[in-house]
């Protein structure tokens, strides 16, 4: 099958040009002017539009069981939503397995979840929920099989202590894998939460107050120092929500330490006032939403290059689940927001169309750097001969208001309801196949492929 995309502006992280793009058998074959492919072929007119590499979202949680509830998006509805939002690859953070389970256990479970459902290509981050000799021995074997990143938690049920973190950092570094971490100070959060609950203060606002930014920033600083102690091990901070943590990361980067960081649209565009609304429980996530000042600091990091990736942390629980389980108590509410369908459009509208970032920087944040960090480059995150024909076409002339009834996930609400975006996703192609076009999903379950990722190689700092 041949697909010729004509008259668009093709954008990569290192530049843009008005040119045609030819995809053949799912692979980009040629870029240039006046391409005349062999018949037959499909022609797509992208006049006035940007032609970007398909999005790479390296932080989703599909079909995750958090003990009190299972998220309502599985690998079909979640990847369907991703496709309709211009994302053609996801790397899912696997949930915790049974106490004492092997690393491989969750990989086998999650491959089963995704195999016949995923619409787009996918991989997984390993999850390390305890440390022993068997787990440490499994890491290099898992890395050789294409899992080149693993996640540690400093909070929640399976948090690791500093000694365990050091052991994990060392072994992951030796194995060619990147350590990712959810950084929050669990003890400080538990103390604050207990104070509020004892005082009967259980409204959504107290979720944010129980997890102040210092809890996150302290854990970021601690992880940076532990990574240095562990032999300058590479480190990736997930879902950054505040400027103090970013300051610590800037300092580490200035000292040439191999650290990278992602943030998410919710931390750029939503703020803590959401907790004071009638439906504030729908905004419970961790880290919580911060104030507008912290938003501004994150936007500075987006603009000046201090932040490397924009992902989503898509983790969907319905309002019915939230209200039934929490009964008005923030501490009992399952955490997470939907957003995998909105990431590309929100960042394009609030970043590119406002002049905060260039189209090239948009590519770097949404596809190129995620692909480079997580062993998918140049197959993903790039439009060049030999790369996968993963494409999102965005029309900057169109204005759209986000409405949940038009979205494709399995949630019963959107945190972005009513947001007006300048720029619309008009078509998504995965390996040359159109899977979304002009508001209609055209893909099918099970067409996504599991991606064996290459060992971690640090991009130039």
UniProtKB/Swiss-Prot annotation:
Example of a GO cellular component annotation carried by this entry: cytosol
List of residues binding a divalent metal cation 2: 151, 182, 239
EC supergroup of this enzyme: hydrolase
Signal peptide feature range: none
Coiled coil: none
Sequence intervals crossing the membrane: none
Binding residues for a divalent metal cation 1: 59, 61, 151, 313
One GO molecular-function entry: metal ion binding
Catalytic reaction(s) noted: D-5-phenylhydantoin + H2O = N-carbamoyl-D-phenylglycine + H(+)
Keywords: Hydrolase, Metal-binding
Cofactor note: Binds 2 divalent metal cations per subunit.
Residues found modified as N6-carboxylysine: 151
EC number: 3.5.2.-
Gene3D superfamilies referenced in this protein's UniProt entry, alphabetically: Metal-dependent hydrolases, Urease, subunit C, domain 1
Any one of the GO BP annotations: pyrimidine nucleobase catabolic process
Positions that bind substrate: 156, 286, 335
Post-translational modification: Carboxylation allows a single lysine to coordinate two divalent metal cations.
Cofactor(s) required, per the database record: a divalent metal cation
General function of this protein: Catalyzes the stereospecific hydrolysis of the cyclic amide bond of D-hydantoin derivatives with an aromatic side chains at the 5'-position. Has no activity on dihydropyrimidines. The physiological function is unknown.
NCBIfam families in the cross-refs: D-hydantoinase
Homology family: Belongs to the metallo-dependent hydrolases superfamily. Hydantoinase/dihydropyrimidinase family.
Subunit structure: Homotetramer.
Name of the protein described by the UniProt record: D-phenylhydantoinase
Gene behind the chain: hyuA
């Amino acid at each position: 099958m041949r697909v010729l995309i004509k008259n668009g502006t093709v954008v990569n992280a290192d530049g843009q040009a008005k040119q045609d793009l030819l995809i053949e058998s799912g692979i980009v074959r040629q870029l240039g002017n006046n391409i005349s492919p062999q018949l037959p072929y499909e022609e797509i007119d992208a006049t006035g539009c940007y032609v970007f590499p398909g999005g790479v979202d390296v932080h989703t949680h599909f079909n995750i069981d958090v003990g009190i509830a299972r998220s309502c998006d599985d690998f079909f509805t979640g990847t369907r939503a991703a496709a309709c939002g211009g994302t053609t690859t996801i790397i899912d953070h696997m949930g915790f397995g049974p106490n004492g389970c092997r690393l491989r256990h969750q990989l086998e479970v999650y491959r089963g979840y995704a195999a016949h459902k995923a619409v787009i290509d996918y991989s997984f981050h390993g999850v390390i929920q305890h440390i022993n000799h068997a787990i440490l021995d499994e890491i290099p074997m898992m890395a050789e099989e294409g899992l080149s990143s693993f996640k540690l938690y400093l909070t929640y049920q399976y948090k690791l202590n500093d000694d365990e973190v050091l052991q994990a950092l060392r072994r992951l570094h030796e194995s060619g894998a990147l350590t990712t971490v959810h950084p929050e100070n669990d003890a400080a959060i538990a103390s604050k939460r207990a104070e509020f609950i004892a005082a009967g203060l259980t409204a959504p606002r107290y979720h944010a107050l129980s997890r102040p930014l210092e809890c996150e920033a302290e854990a970021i600083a601690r992880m940076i120092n532990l990574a240095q102690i562990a032999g300058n091990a590479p480190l990736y901070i997930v879902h950054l929500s505040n400027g103090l943590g970013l300051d610590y990361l800037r300092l580490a980067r200035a000292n040439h330490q191999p650290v990278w960081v992602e943030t998410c649209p919710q931390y750029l565009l939503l703020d803590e006032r959401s907790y004071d609304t009638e439906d504030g429980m729908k905004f419970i996530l961790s880290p919580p939403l911060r104030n507008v000042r912290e938003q501004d600091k994150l936007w500075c990091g987006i603009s000046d290059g201090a932040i490397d990736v924009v992902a989503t942390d898509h983790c969907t629980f319905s309002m019915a689940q939230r209200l039934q389980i929490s009964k008005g108590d923030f501490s009992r509410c399952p955490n997470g927001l939907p957003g995998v369908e909105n990431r590309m459009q929100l960042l394009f509208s609030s970043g590119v169309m406002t002049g905060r970032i260039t189209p090239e920087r948009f590519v770097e944040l949404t596809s190129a750097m995620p692909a480079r960090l997580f062993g998918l480059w140049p197959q993903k995150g790039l439009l060049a001969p030999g790369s996968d024909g993963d494409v999102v076409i965005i029309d900057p002339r169109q204005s759209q208001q986000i409405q949940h009834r038009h979205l494709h996930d399995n949630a019963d609400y959107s945190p972005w309801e009513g947001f007006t975006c300048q720029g619309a996703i008009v078509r998504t192609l995965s390996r040359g196949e159109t899977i979304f076009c002009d508001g209609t999903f055209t893909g099918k379950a099970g067409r996504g492929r599991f991606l064996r990722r290459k060992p971690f190689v640090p991009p130039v700092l």
